[in-house]
C-alpha cells in the first residue's frame, strides 16, 4: 500500500534548505543533503522551494536565514553545530533571535557518556554543544554529540506579515543527520506543520531499462490517471529508473494502485523493488527467505559486489564469502580457472566468467555463485573488447551456468556500480524463476 500521513488540516508551506560549510563550496566535500532531504520531504508530502549553500561565515549565514524566514514557513539548516571554531550556526542564530544560550544538562551528560563509551578523553570544548537557544526543542543525537534544534520564530519579524515560522538546525555529517531526520525531524514536521490532506506515494524501482523507454511505454497509459490528479515522476540513475507515483486526497490510494498495476503489466520483469529497497536488499532478503547461500568471485569490481551484499543486515546468514582475483594467476590459484581458457579466450570472456563462478561455487559450497570480469578502463580495451566490456557469470546447484555480456562505457567508479547492480539483478531473476 502507498505510504500515508495523517489526514489533518493545515496549509502547505514553503520550505527552504540552507547548507553551511566552506568545504562544500570548495568542492572538498560532496553536498548530498539537498538530494537526500529533498527526497525525504517529498516522500512525506512536502517540497523544497529553495536551497542555498553558504560558507562558515556568520554574516553569510545570518543573511541566508533572515531571507529564508522572510519567505518560508520552515527553514532547515545543516552543519555548524559542532564544537570547533567554524561551527557558528547555533550561536549566530541564538544571537539573531535574541535567544540566550542555556546549558542543557541532558545533552552534557550524553556528550560525556559518548566519550566514556569510546574510552576517549573528552576535551572541555565539546561541551559548548550543550548550550542551546532558550526555548528550543532538542533532537538528541544518537550517532554523535551535536543535537539538532527546532525553534518556533513567533512573531516572525523577518516576514512582512509576522507569520510564525519554524527553524530546524541539523548536524552536518550524513551519518548523524539522516537518522535524526527519519526518527525525529520528520515526525516533528508532520506534527507541527501538517498537510491539508493525506499524502500518498509509491516508488517502483527498475533495472535494465532506460528512462526514455520507460516514459514512452507508460506515459500514454497513465495519462488518464494523471488527469485525475496522479503525479508521475521518473528518476534515472546509472542503469536504473525509479518511477514515482504520488498525490493527495481520498481517491489517491486507488489511483496509485491502478497505476502500479498498469506499470507492472508493462515492465514487471524489470521491477526489482519498491520505495527505498535496493537491489542488494532484495537479493539478500530472498536468499534469507529460501535459506540459500551465495559466494562471489570478482575481478574488475574490486570487492564492491561483496561490499554491497554485506551492507545488508542479515547477510551473514547467506553470504559464504568472496574472492577478489584481479590477476590471471589468482584466478587460477583461488578459483581453478584453466590456464588454457585464459590463453584462448582472455580474462574478459564468457568462458572465464563461467569458470570463475564454478570455482567460487566449488570452493565455498554455496548454493549460488556470481562472477564479474571486465575492463574498467581507461586503458586495456581492444576493438573486440572495448573499455566498458564486462562478463557476468552465475552458477547454481542443480542449474546450468549462465554468462551474459554487458557494456558499461563509464568512468571506473560508475562502471563498477553498474556492473555489480547487473550481477545482482541476474541472480534476482534466477531466484524469481525458481522461487
Please report, for each region that a protein language model flagged, where it lies by residue.
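Glycine-rich phosphate/diphosphate-binding loop of Rossmann-like nucleotide-binding domains
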Residues: 12-52, 56
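Conserved hydrophobic helix-helix packing surfaces used for dimerization/oligomerization
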Residues: 15-17, 167, 294
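Glycine-rich beta-strand-to-loop/alpha-helix junction loops that act as flexible
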Residues: 20-22, 77-85, 171-172, 248-249, ...
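Glycine-rich oxoanion-binding loops at beta->alpha junctions
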Residues: 38, 42-67, 103-144, 330-367
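Proline/glycine-rich low-complexity loops and linkers
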Residues: 60-66, 70, 87-192
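Accessory alpha-helical/coil subdomains and C-terminal extensions
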Residues: 155-239, 246-248, 255-256
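Short alpha-helical segments enriched in small residues
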Residues: 253-435
Amino acid at each position: 500500500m502507498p505510504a500515508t500521513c495523517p489526514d489533518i488540516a493545515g496549509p502547505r508551506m514553503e520550505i527552504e534548505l540552507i547548507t553551511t560549510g566552506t568545504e562544500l563550496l570548495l568542492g572538498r566535500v560532496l553536498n548530498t543533503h539537498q538530494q537526500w532531504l529533498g527526497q525525504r520531504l517529498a516522500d512525506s508530502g512536502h517540497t523544497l522551494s529553495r536551497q542555498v549553500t553558504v560558507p562558515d561565515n556568520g554574516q553569510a549565514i545570518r543573511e541566508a536565514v533572515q531571507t529564508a524566514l522572510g519567505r518560508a514557513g520552515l527553514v532547515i539548516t545543516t552543519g555548524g553545530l559542532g564544537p570547533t571554531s567554524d561551527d557558528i550556526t547555533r550561536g549566530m542564530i541564538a544571537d539573531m533571535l535574541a535567544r540566550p544560550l542555556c546549558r542543557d544538562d541532558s545533552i552534557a551528560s550524553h556528550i560525556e557518556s559518548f566519550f566514556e563509551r569510546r574510552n576517549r578523553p573528552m576535551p572541555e570544548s565539546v561541551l559548548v554543544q550543550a548550550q542551546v537557544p532558550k526555548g528550543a526543542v532538542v533532537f538528541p543525537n544518537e550517532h554523535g554529540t551535536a543535537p539538532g534544534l527546532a525553534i518556533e520564530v513567533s512573531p516572525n519579524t523577518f516576514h512582512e506579515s509576522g507569520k510564525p515560522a519554524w527553524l530546524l538546525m541539523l548536524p552536518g555529517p550524513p551519518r548523524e543527520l539522516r537518522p535524526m531526520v527519519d526518527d525525529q525531524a520528520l515526525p516533528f514536521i508532520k506534527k507541527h506543520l501538517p498537510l491539508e490532506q493525506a499524502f500518498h506515494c509509491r516508488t517502483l524501482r527498475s533495472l535494465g531499462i532506460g528512462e526514455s523507454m520507460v516514459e514512452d511505454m507508460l506515459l500514454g497509459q497513465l495519462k488518464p490517471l494523471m488527469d485525475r490528479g496522479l503525479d508521475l515522476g521518473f528518476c534515472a540513475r546509472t542503469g536504473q529508473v525509479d518511477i514515482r507515483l504520488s498525490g493527495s486526497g481520498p481517491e489517491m490510494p486507488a489511483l496509485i494502485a491502478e497505476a502500479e498495476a498498469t506499470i507492472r503489466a508493462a515492465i514487471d520483469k524489470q521491477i526489482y523493488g519498491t520505495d527505498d529497497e535496493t537491489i542488494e536488499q532484495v537479493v539478500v532478503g530472498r536468499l534469507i527467505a529460501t535459506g540459500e547461500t551465495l559466494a562471489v568471485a570478482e575481478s574488475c569490481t574490486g570487492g564492491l559486489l561483496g561490499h554491497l551484499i554485506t551492507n545488508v543486515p542479515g547477510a551473514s546468514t547467506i553470504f559464504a564469502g568472496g574472492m577478489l582475483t584481479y590477476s590471471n594467476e589468482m584466478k587460477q590459484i583461488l578459483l581453478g580457472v584453466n590456464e588454457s581458457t585464459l590463453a584462448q579466450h582472455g580474462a574478459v570472456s564468457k568462458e572465464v566468467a563461467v569458470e570463475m563462478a564454478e570455482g567460487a561455487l566449488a570452493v565455498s559450497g554455496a548454493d549460488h555463485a556470481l562472477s564479474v570480469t571486465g575492463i574498467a578502463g581507461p586503458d586495456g580495451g581492444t576493438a573486440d573488447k572495448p573499455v566498458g566490456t564486462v562478463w557476468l557469470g552465475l552458477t547454481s546447484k542443480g542449474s546450468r551456468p549462465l554468462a551474459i555480456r554487458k557494456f558499461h562505457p563509464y568512468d571506473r567508479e560508475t562502471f563498477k556500480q553498474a556492473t555489480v547492480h547487473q550481477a545482482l539483478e541476474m541472480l534476482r531473476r534466477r531466484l524469481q524463476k525458481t522461487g
